[in-house]
Amino acid sequence: MDHSSSSNSCFSVGSTSPGAVVLLYSKELKKWDEFEDVLEERRHVSDLKFAMKCYTPLVYKGITPCKPSDIKCSVLNSEEIHYVIKQLSKESLQPVEVLREEACEILDEMSHKLRLGAIRFFAFALSKIFKQIFSKVRVNEEGIQKLQRAIQEHPVVLLPSHRSYIDFLMLSFLLYNYDLPVPVIAAGMDFLGMKMVGELLRMSGAFFMRRTFGGNKLYWAVFSEYVKTMLRNGYAPVEFFLEGTRSRSAKTLTPKFGLLNIVMEPFFKREVFDTYLVPISISYDRILEETLYAYELLGVPKPKESTTGLLKARRILSEKFGNIHVYFGDPVSLRSLAAGRMGRSPYNLVPRYIPQKQSEEMHTFVTEVAYKMQLLQIQNLVLSPWPLIVAVLLQNRPSIDFDALLEKTLWLKGLTQAFGGFLTWPDNEPAEAVIQSSILLHSNIVSLVKDRVILKMECGDSELVDGLIFQHITLLMCLAYRNQLLNVFVRPSLVAMALQMTPGFRKEDVYSCFRFLCSVFSDEFIFLPGNALKDFEEGCYLLCKSEAIQVMTRDILVTEKGNSVLEFLIGLFKPFVESYQIICKYLLNEEEDYFTEKQYFIRVRKFTSQLLDQGASQCYDVLSSDVQKNALAAFVRLGVVEKKKVNNDYIFNVNEPATTKLEEMLGCKTPVGKPATAKL
């Protein structure tokens, strides 16, 4: 990694030395020749032969051979379920037999029925579908080899990123392809509504969980014991999504902790020696659900999963979606993560079968592990040329000359690589051809007309489609692809924003503003809790490396070359600042004292649409329900909005002075104070 001379005196804000920062944030360049296109062989070998191949996967050395029905029996007869049923019987005065019957019904609803025949069916069908719609499915072979070893040593938990319904099908397909055990997968109950398909998924390893348990202690006990039993037995790798649901905006969603808590428990209760956590990054050139996501972000309810809907979706088989990159990260030992941090002795004080309330220390540890896993996922997400192209287009909309687009995209390519972005760019093709092929792949969004690249703003002669403004649909699809870049740029961009918002150049003031921005946007982007100083140092280091700034003892100075870099970075992140300002203005205009979350979404959507229609704003990010939801969560956390529970629902009311102050701080009318992260 090159060290610019200006970075040598960077980091006197904290105790971390410059050398340590360089080591901390230098990212090993990934070698593309180590990636294998698994579809290459599929195109030359019969799909039927592939589906019917001899499948003898490597298994965990401590495996307890059992059938799916044996797991159910083991759960029902476990000490933990017996204990919980007895306790609930005392509390509710219901007979033990009734509660046991309920536990049986819960298990029947959730449990998988893993069968080799179903796996072979999916192998055959998915091979045909993937060859039809994807050019390549590229996998890092080294990651597969490490996973092969890990599966034999200890129970394994697979933690993939989640951008599409294809994610879990793709992983099962790949593990079957490499003769690894197909995972058991935590899936939402939505799929059970799909006739035949739901049962097929169950037979291919899916087990089903309700979105909310609603305080149902028996359901939680049965579900957690079911997952722990599979993990302890080494039955198969357990797979779930830390994000809990698909990200519609292509940004990583903040993690959910429930399942992570469950899979850690056998280790802390000394039921297994160790557990491997494997972060997996799945990247798409073009997302299958791109249009559906734009509709959902504009407030159109998600269509219910159904077999009919699946059959209607067959039209995607006539479209092309480019490449998929699947990066299997290094298996992370839970034992190593806990060493020196979390002792197992508290679990020795009571019998294993008695559920324990989670300690504050344990909650902090689980939270930290979840964020670390997500940061590993983010580090290995692959960028295609398209997010770079669309980022340039959005800052020059509605159209740009092709040569100007080419020049700006190549400049951004250099900056992305300098910032450690994991970028795939065909080096054997001229840059013009790379950009033209990207435009062709996304011809539903952009077109090349007479040497100008134009965003599509109309559908035929109409500006409306399904009651929505077509321009809004196009822009939200573009914003989702641009969002793929934000992971690479978030820290240097927030330093750039802080430099713009801070009067003067004092490093201490810039850091204070950076912390404020991290606090406000911690629902938008993934930051390791308590890591603000290191995040600031990384942002400064990358800006020094690109020669955009010089960090002196007390001040941060912008170089002559740095203006173009900072201008681009600010343009990338300013929409989030402006969106939150607009939502502050809506809250200050809110006439009702109290409102529900549903009312908030309806009213904020109406308010923002009017602003855009009137030309009072060009910030289309604010239309996204994802941004609106994250802003509300941030405002509650910062004390700008108060949240109360009334009759099983939450109501909100606005703290006007705090809202005014936040709006002024975001708009640079009021300097960010110290400490910046305190409640407003």
UniProtKB/Swiss-Prot annotation:
Q: Where in the cell is it found?
A: Peroxisome membrane
Sorted alphabetically, which keywords does the UniProt record give?
Answer: Acetylation, Acyltransferase, Membrane, Peroxisome, Phosphoprotein, Transferase
Its UniProt pathway annotation is: Membrane lipid metabolism; glycerophospholipid metabolism
Q: Where are the Phosphoserine modifications?
A: S12, S17
Identify the CDD domains for this entry: LPLAT_DHAPAT-like
Write out the coiled-coil annotation as residue ranges. none
Q: What class of enzyme is it?
A: transferase
List modified residues, type N6-acetyllysine: K643
Q: One biological-process term from Gene Ontology?
A: ether lipid biosynthetic process
Per its record, the protein catalyses: dihydroxyacetone phosphate + an acyl-CoA = a 1-acylglycerone 3-phosphate + CoA; dihydroxyacetone phosphate + hexadecanoyl-CoA = 1-hexadecanoylglycerone 3-phosphate + CoA
Q: Which SUPFAM superfamilies match?
A: Glycerol-3-phosphate (1)-acyltransferase (SSF69593)
Superkingdom of the organism of origin? Eukaryota
Protein name, per record: Dihydroxyacetone phosphate acyltransferase
Q: Major place of localization?
A: membrane
InterPro entries assigned to the protein according to its UniProt record, in alphabetical order: DHAPAT (IPR028353), GPAT/DHAPAT (IPR022284), GPAT/DHAPAT_C (IPR045520), GPAT/DHAPAT_LPLAT (IPR041728), Plipid/glycerol_acylTrfase (IPR002123)
Native source organism of the sequence: Bos taurus (Bovine)
Q: Assembly and interactions?
A: Part of a heterotrimeric complex composed of GNPAT, AGPS and a modified form of GNPAT.
Give the EC number(s) listed in the UniProt record.
2.3.1.42
The UniProt entry's sequence similarity note says: Belongs to the GPAT/DAPAT family.
User: In the UniProt record, which is one GO cellular component term?
Assistant: peroxisomal membrane
Extent of motif Microbody targeting signal = 678-680
- Residue numbers of motif HXXXXD motif? 162-167
